[in-house]
UniProtKB/Swiss-Prot annotation:
PANTHER family: MULTIPLE INOSITOL POLYPHOSPHATE PHOSPHATASE 1, MULTIPLE INOSITOL POLYPHOSPHATE PHOSPHATASE-RELATED. The gene is Minpp1. It catalyses: 1D-myo-inositol hexakisphosphate + H2O = 1D-myo-inositol 1,2,4,5,6-pentakisphosphate + phosphate; 1D-myo-inositol 1,2,4,5,6-pentakisphosphate + H2O = 1D-myo-inositol 1,2,5,6-tetrakisphosphate + phosphate; 1D-myo-inositol 1,2,5,6-tetrakisphosphate + H2O = 1D-myo-inositol 1,2,6-trisphosphate + phosphate; 1D-myo-inositol 1,2,6-trisphosphate + H2O = 1D-myo-inositol 1,2-bisphosphate + phosphate. GO terms for cellular component: endoplasmic reticulum lumen; extracellular space; plasma membrane. It comes from Mus musculus (Mouse). Keywords: Cell membrane, Endoplasmic reticulum, Glycoprotein, Hydrolase, Membrane, Secreted, Signal. This is Multiple inositol polyphosphate phosphatase 1. The lineage of its organism: Eukaryota, Metazoa, Chordata, Craniata, Vertebrata.
Length: 481
């Protein structure tokens, strides 16, 4: 096992990191089922925001703690001086709303009329133990903690200078107030503890040198603090028109008819929301327990593509390119990231140590998607609508590929010693889910930091959250007073 982990590590990784990788890898394989993935579903690529991180990064199915060094990751005379990471929480339980819909669906199955030679799938589901409870309500599961510990170990091995023992007390952590994010940040710190102290049990997060994460919902849940978004999108009954239209469209009706026949229930007792929660239950059982749920047997790949598109439509219109405010509401977070990078540049120019070499921010898919949209990523030529499912089969915007559980967007700032000019001293790379993300303005894997700032000048200088998020004032005439 140690040889397997070592073969993926750069030569600069300390032996302690290798030992930690081996120990955590051993723990990972013993603690949860399904790691060899004999139960991996053919439906896994279509689970959208409920996708396991390892399904978006298949090399982790072989060894979940071995870092994969992207060949385009900058090396040589350029040294990383700061890392700013935006991280989605790890695998979670379904929400109470989803669990109640699942109970409703199971109730339909248990009261259906049994038929001779009936569906074995329906019979299996009627007997399927419903182990989800309302108390779970989106909380982080043990697999989600493992997602975070393993991510911490891989990043520490990939950037050993930044995650050095000396920098530990200078780590800066920010989190959403949601328990799944707070718990994810704590699990990440536990993974770092394993990196620094292989084999020793981690202390309580409050006792760690770097201190507990700081809650900042204005950054991590900016959408809750943007009145224009809340008015125009969140509370607007017509904002998700294309989502609702697709639910009653021909593609979804075909799935509905097929599922009703499989479950042996009247078609009018089902709707798109119940079908979707059944599909997600397949994903939850796989992600949380590593088991093949009988709910997976209800669907085939054609059904999965339709249900993935339904989920992507919601993400597109509520969190991405559907409405301008979706992305513009994240300006404050984007600017905050560049404030950290600017400060690191300034400190290096003054030959001072970088005060915050690693900044870790824990949020949601709803945090990452608007920011990536603001930066211009995963934008298709035509918008996703209720009526172009077939045309969008090869779309860029697939939420499961972009923001699975534990997804991460990482900004890495480098200082290059042999630069030909002052502008070339500082270069930057972006990583999405540990893979180099080409810069939007050049499609290159690395670029000058100042060039990136120039490309995003409008957002950095002109996007003011107070103005962007202010709903338009009502035009009241004197006759209306």
């Amino acid at each position: 096992m140690l040889r397997g982990a070592r073969s993926h590590l750069p030569a600069s990784v300390a032996p302690a990191a290798v030992l930690a990788a081996a120990l955590l890898s051993s723990f990972a394989r013993c603690s949860l089922p399904g790691r060899g993935d004999p139960v991996a579903s053919v439906l896994s690529p279509y689970f959208g925001t409920k996708t396991r991180y390892e399904d978006a990064n298949p090399w982790l199915l072989v060894d979940p703690v071995a870092p994969r060094r992207d060949p385009e990751l900058l090396a040589g005379t350029c040294t990383p001086v700061q890392l700013v990471a935006l991280i989605r929480h790890g695998t979670r339980y379904p929400t109470t709303k989803q669990i109640r819909k699942l109970k409703q669906l199971q109730g339909l199955l248990q009261t259906r009329e049994s038929r001779d030679g009936g569906s074995q799938v329906a019979a299996a589901l009627a007997e399927w133990p419903l182990w989800y409870g309302d108390w779970m309500d989106g909380q982080l599961v043990e697999k989600g903690r493992q997602d975070m510990r393993q991510l911490a170990l891989r990043l520490a091995a990939l950037f050993p200078d930044l995650f050095s023992r000396e920098n530990y007390d200078r780590l800066r952590l920010i989190t959403s107030s949601k328990h799944r994010c707070v718990d994810s940040s704590a699990a990440f710190l536990q993974g770092l503890w394993q990196h620094y102290h292989p084999g020793l049990p981690p202390p309580d997060v409050s006792d760690m040198e770097c201190g507990p994460p700081r809650i900042n919902d204005k950054l991590m849940r900016f959408f809750d603090h943007c009145e224009k978004f809340l008015t125009d999108v969140e509370r607007n009954e017509t904002a998700l028109y294309h989502v609702e239209a697709f639910k009653t469209g021909p593609e979804m009706q075909k799935v509905l008819k097929k599922v009703a026949a499989t479950l042996q229930v009247p078609m009018n007792s089902l709707n798109a929301d119940l079908i979707q929660v059944a599909f997600f239950t397949c994903s939850f059982d796989l992600a949380i327990k590593g088991v093949h749920s009988p709910w997976c047997d209800v669907f085939d790949v054609d059904d999965a593509r339709v249900l993935e598109y339904l989920n992507d439509l919601k993400q597109y219109w509520k969190r991405s390119y559907g409405y301008t405010i979706n992305s513009r509401s994240s300006c404050n977070l984007f600017q905050d990231i560049f404030l950290h990078l600017d400060k690191a540049v300034e400190q290096k120019q003054r030959s001072q140590p970088v005060s915050s070499p690693v900044i870790l921010q824990f949020g949601h898919a709803e945090t990452l998607l608007p920011l990536l949209s603001l930066m211009g990523y995963f934008k298709d030529k035509e918008p996703l609508t209720a009526y172009n499912f077939e045309e969008q089969v090869n779309r860029k915007f697939r939420s499961g590929h972009i923001v699975p559980y534990a997804s991460n967007l990482i900004f890495v700032l480098y200082h290059c010693d042999n630069a030909q000019s002052p502008e070339e001293q500082f270069q930057i790379q972006l990583l999405l889910n540990e893979k180099v993300l080409p810069l939007a303005h050049s499609q290159r894997p690395v670029g000058l930091y100042e060039e990136l700032k120039t490309h995003y000048r409008d957002i950095l200088q002109s996007c003011q959250t107070s103005k962007e998020c202010s709903p338009p004032k009502a035009n009241i005439t004197s006759d209306e007073l």
